[in-house]
Amino acid sequence: MSGSFWTSTQRHHWQYTKASLAKERQKLWLLECQLFPQGLNIVMDSKQNGIEQSITKNIPITHRDLHYDKDYNLRIYCYFLIMKLGRRLNIRQYALATAHIYLSRFLIKASVREINLYMLVTTCVYLACKVEECPQYIRTLVSEARTLWPEFIPPDPTKVTEFEFYLLEELESYLIVHHPYQSLKQIVQVLKQPPFQITLSSDDLQNCWSLINDSYINDVHLLYPPHIIAVACLFITISIHGKPTKGSSLASAASEAIRDPKNSSSPVQIAFNRFMAESLVDLEEVMDTIQEQITLYDHWDKYHEQWIKFLLHTLYLRPASAI
């Protein structure tokens, strides 16, 4: 086990550049086009002239739906699946974050069309809990997963252990994950000291923690070190520091604050900018992480859970003759 990100397998085996990540996903894209050239046929109810009828529509394989790298509906849905299962079992956030990383890494190499996504989520949570030293009884885990997704999770717990071997193979047994949460704690302590003297409220820290949680939906954990993500989330938090959201979500408030040039003139923002300059953090990576968050929240506003659930139900439960 590596106690430092800089000597870890996360950095040396699972950190990509944007170009190398795009190359890996292009390989999967081409494989999907070969394996599933027919796309996905879905049956939709339509009403014309007062008469209800069913129509069949084809979603081409080249469409973004059900491609993890392109479909934010799918990304956000996966995030909620892990969180729902985690809440039922009272699993701590570190383990759920590790499960998110396992899922993201796995879906670089495998398509949701060739595996059971719900089994993948269950197995990622099961393995992450073991690695993060908060193991769950497999029967309890499977029981809770079946309560949430009875159509997709078989009652036999050995199916999860079988999937675990598949998951371990794709992860190449590199399981230790370093998260931004620890970096956040360290940076907050530094900010309290001179010359910065920035003390964040409990609400600010909670907002920052939530931003880090949301960041697991996008690719930043595959691209940048944990401290970059922590700094980016702190930057967003400080940008909306003390500003009422008027009932809007943290997501919308963050997006609006980053686009508002007046934020750069606040004393807290000036002090934090000084911290970033003196710490020699890679500003390009920080700004790209912030942009990734804004892009995520723009897509989140358009999130359509019923649509992605419908597609997955059609994909996994359709009769063999319809494939």
UniProtKB/Swiss-Prot annotation:
<dbReference type="GO" id="GO:0034605">
    <property type="term" value="P:cellular response to heat"/>
</dbReference>
<comment type="similarity">
    <text>Belongs to the cyclin family. Cyclin C subfamily.</text>
</comment>
<keyword id="KW-0678">Repressor</keyword>
<comment type="subunit">
    <text>Component of the SRB8-11 complex which consists of SRB8, SSN2/SRB9, SSN3/SRB10 and SSN8/SRB11. The SRB8-11 complex associates with the Mediator complex. The SSN3/SRB10 and SSN8/SRB11 kinase-cyclin pair also associate with the RNA polymerase II holoenzyme. Interacts with ASK10.</text>
</comment>
<comment type="function">
    <text>Component of the SRB8-11 complex. The SRB8-11 complex is a regulatory module of the Mediator complex which is itself involved in regulation of basal and activated RNA polymerase II-dependent transcription. The SRB8-11 complex may be involved in the transcriptional repression of a subset of genes regulated by Mediator. It may inhibit the association of the Mediator complex with RNA polymerase II to form the holoenzyme complex. The SRB8-11 complex phosphorylates the C-terminal domain (CTD) of the largest subunit of RNA polymerase II RPB1 at serines 2 and 5.</text>
</comment>
<dbReference type="Pfam" id="PF00134">
    <property type="entry name" value="Cyclin_N"/>
</dbReference>
<dbReference type="InterPro" id="IPR036915">
    <property type="entry name" value="Cyclin-like_sf"/>
</dbReference>
<dbReference type="GO" id="GO:1990508">
    <property type="term" value="C:CKM complex"/>
</dbReference>
<dbReference type="GO" id="GO:0016592">
    <property type="term" value="C:mediator complex"/>
</dbReference>
<dbReference type="GO" id="GO:0000122">
    <property type="term" value="P:negative regulation of transcription by RNA polymerase II"/>
</dbReference>
<dbReference type="GO" id="GO:0016538">
    <property type="term" value="F:cyclin-dependent protein serine/threonine kinase regulator activity"/>
</dbReference>
<protein>
    <recommendedName>
        <fullName>RNA polymerase II holoenzyme cyclin-like subunit</fullName>
    </recommendedName>
</protein>
<dbReference type="GO" id="GO:0000979">
    <property type="term" value="F:RNA polymerase II core promoter sequence-specific DNA binding"/>
</dbReference>
<keyword id="KW-0010">Activator</keyword>
<dbReference type="InterPro" id="IPR006671">
    <property type="entry name" value="Cyclin_N"/>
</dbReference>
<dbReference type="GO" id="GO:0045944">
    <property type="term" value="P:positive regulation of transcription by RNA polymerase II"/>
</dbReference>
<feature type="domain" description="Cyclin N-terminal">
    <location>
        <begin position="45"/>
        <end position="176"/>
    </location>
</feature>
<keyword id="KW-0539">Nucleus</keyword>
<keyword id="KW-0195">Cyclin</keyword>
<dbReference type="InterPro" id="IPR043198">
    <property type="entry name" value="Cyclin/Ssn8"/>
</dbReference>
<dbReference type="GO" id="GO:0051321">
    <property type="term" value="P:meiotic cell cycle"/>
</dbReference>
<keyword id="KW-0804">Transcription</keyword>
<dbReference type="GO" id="GO:0005634">
    <property type="term" value="C:nucleus"/>
</dbReference>
<dbReference type="GO" id="GO:0000411">
    <property type="term" value="P:positive regulation of transcription by galactose"/>
</dbReference>
<keyword id="KW-0805">Transcription regulation</keyword>
<dbReference type="InterPro" id="IPR013763">
    <property type="entry name" value="Cyclin-like_dom"/>
</dbReference>
